[in-house]
Amino acid sequence: MTGKPSIAALIVAAGQGVRSGGGVPKQYRRIGGKAVLAHAVDALARHPAIGSVQVVIGAGQEDLHAEAVGGRTLPPPVTGGATRRDSVIAGLAAVDADIVLIHDAARPFLPAAVIDRLIAALDGSDGAVPALAVADTLAKGDALLGDAVPRDGLHRVQTPQAFRRADILAAHRAWDPAREATDDAQVARAHGLSVAIVEGDRSLEKLTFAADFEAAEERMAMISRTAMGFDVHGFTAGDGVQLGGVRIAHDRALAGHSDADVALHALTDALLGTIAAGDIGSHFPPSDQRWKGADSAMFLAHARDLVAAAGGIVDFVDLTIICEAPKVGPHRAAIRDRIAALLGLTAGQVSVKATTTERLGFTGRREGIAAQAVATVRVPSI
């Protein structure tokens, strides 16, 4: 291939089956705290060669999709058709790229190296698929074992499958609708396209049965991370402060570009720290006029959503407010309840404390308020 073609990913997530259990289609079941679909989206979206990720969903799955991939920047989902081929055609029509990688949502564990191999293989073929050589003995039979089937040259074909978009779209449109294809490579070959085999990966196994999800959960064993946030704001003229999302009357106000809620700022940094996502200033720079006077609850909600997008689960947060005045004690319960509501936690998962510096330092001189927060979050081990 010449030049640098644009590359998009197309995730087929239109299935309606619930035989894997869980009460929802398998692409929306959660493993490691994150929907199967979200794992697939993230694996493709973080690859530097892929410019966009388009998801095809089933009719009536809009809410499930929104919940699964919330917090991510994606094009609107496309609604698929009655068959997988119909869904792929709908998705291909919505994609604007030279090359497309078509992936089954039920394969959440996609190594970047597989994507690299697929893209490279298109230099010498019309399409490329990842596959693993069959290692087990194959045999015919029902209740009784029949004859063995020679396994030489047999492969288990996986996804994603890579093609030039125009080629695979033409192949799908030319396919006999009376027949149902098992994958896109079958459609491509029937249209005369060459399809290369690249090395697949055992982690790309498709999730189908309840036992598959049990194995995936073991793979996604959660680990605990703890991070700290700290913030300071000085006093200025005013008649009250915002602390932990609660308005408290006072003879002064806190100075800051936003509403200067020092408690929520510290807590936001703590949450961002658990997923190594920088600090509040990198997401909401004080030089940006959009955040002038902004409600800091928005900042905390953003950090919460980023943690969720990473598959994280917030277990506990601890907040210490350091000041001589105003007195925090009378407002402690309200602050705790407000933070719990913002993070979707119970009151028992939020600790709010207050202390002074015994009249030492800037807080002791009543020049401002400091806050320190600690967040404990479970995240997937991979």
UniProtKB/Swiss-Prot annotation:
It catalyses: 2-C-methyl-D-erythritol 4-phosphate + CTP + H(+) = 4-CDP-2-C-methyl-D-erythritol + diphosphate; 4-CDP-2-C-methyl-D-erythritol 2-phosphate = 2-C-methyl-D-erythritol 2,4-cyclic diphosphate + CMP. The record marks 151, 206 as: Positions MEP for the nucleophilic attack. GO terms for molecular function: 2-C-methyl-D-erythritol 2,4-cyclodiphosphate synthase activity; 2-C-methyl-D-erythritol 4-phosphate cytidylyltransferase activity; metal ion binding. A divalent metal cation binds at residues 231, 233, 265. Its EC number is 2.7.7.60, 4.6.1.12. Residues 225-382 are annotated as: 2-C-methyl-D-erythritol 2,4-cyclodiphosphate synthase. Disulfide bonds: none annotated. Residues 1-225 are annotated as: 2-C-methyl-D-erythritol 4-phosphate cytidylyltransferase. Keywords: Isoprene biosynthesis, Lyase, Metal-binding, Multifunctional enzyme, Nucleotidyltransferase, Transferase. Pathway: Isoprenoid biosynthesis; isopentenyl diphosphate biosynthesis via DXP pathway; isopentenyl diphosphate from 1-deoxy-D-xylulose 5-phosphate: step 2/6; Isoprenoid biosynthesis; isopentenyl diphosphate biosynthesis via DXP pathway; isopentenyl diphosphate from 1-deoxy-D-xylulose 5-phosphate: step 4/6. GO terms for biological process: isopentenyl diphosphate biosynthetic process, methylerythritol 4-phosphate pathway; terpenoid biosynthetic process. The record marks 19, 26, 257, 356 as: Transition state stabilizer. Its cofactor is a divalent metal cation. 4-CDP-2-C-methyl-D-erythritol 2-phosphate binds at residues 231-233, 257-258, 279-281, 355-358, 362, 365. Bifunctional enzyme that catalyzes the formation of 4-diphosphocytidyl-2-C-methyl-D-erythritol from CTP and 2-C-methyl-D-erythritol 4-phosphate (MEP) (IspD), and catalyzes the conversion of 4-diphosphocytidyl-2-C-methyl-D-erythritol 2-phosphate (CDP-ME2P) to 2-C-methyl-D-erythritol 2,4-cyclodiphosphate (ME-CPP) with a corresponding release of cytidine 5-monophosphate (CMP) (IspF). In the N-terminal section; belongs to the IspD/TarI cytidylyltransferase family. IspD subfamily. This is Bifunctional enzyme IspD/IspF. It comes from Rhizorhabdus wittichii (strain DSM 6014 / CCUG 31198 / JCM 15750 / NBRC 105917 / EY 4224 / RW1) (Sphingomonas wittichii). The lineage of its organism: Bacteria, Pseudomonadati, Pseudomonadota, Alphaproteobacteria, Sphingomonadales. The gene is ispDF.
